[in-house]
């Protein structure tokens, strides 16, 4: 049973691209398989190409993602400043990690978090995160922060619970360049963990 402190704000934090440097590790993995990411949009579909410049289909993308998580989850590098920032924020906030990693790789992600000294409650989710965040906000009743790199997840949360304070955090400059409306749904936009600290502790 998850126990959330009623006396502290709760910070719900994504993992890939927020804690773990997903695209850096994923691109290295793709190159080793004679594949590459072409950075045309904020999506996987249509962006993973083979050495003949042919886009992988949905089934091939699923296989590629699953193989990546199978072999690389425990060794992915961290986003700069993530671990130390969470440690600082945990002094005044209850932290929950909510990731859309496929459920079958949940234990591998737990190992990776522990290996990097990130010891907070961790939950795997599928699809939009709005309902999960709404559930947690109903338990907590206090101030809630939500950090994610996906505008779609920020929108999902705002549609379910408008009082959640949202940060769209995109530390990867290539991904940031693909976002057309950074402040359309989020309360704050950030590309550095030090800015997240300032915003949350302000």
Language model segments and positions:
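Active-site neighborhood of HAD-like aspartate-dependent phosphohydrolases
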Residues: 1-63
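Glycine-rich phosphate-binding loop signature in dinucleotide/nucleotide-binding domains
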Residues: 5-7, 91-93, 137-144
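Short acidic-hydrophobic, aromatic-tinged amphipathic segments that line or gate anion-handling sites
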Residues: 121-126, 185-196
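Substrate-recognition "cap/lid" segment bordering the active-site pocket of phosphatases
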Residues: 102-145, 151-159
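Short, charged, surface-exposed secondary-structure boundary motifs
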Residues: 130-135, 175-184, 198-201
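Acidic, Mg2+-coordinating phosphoryl-transfer loop and its flanking beta/alpha structural elements
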Residues: 146-191
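Substrate-recognition element of Asp-dependent hydrolases with the DxDx(T/V) motif
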Residues: 73-77, 82-112, 122-125
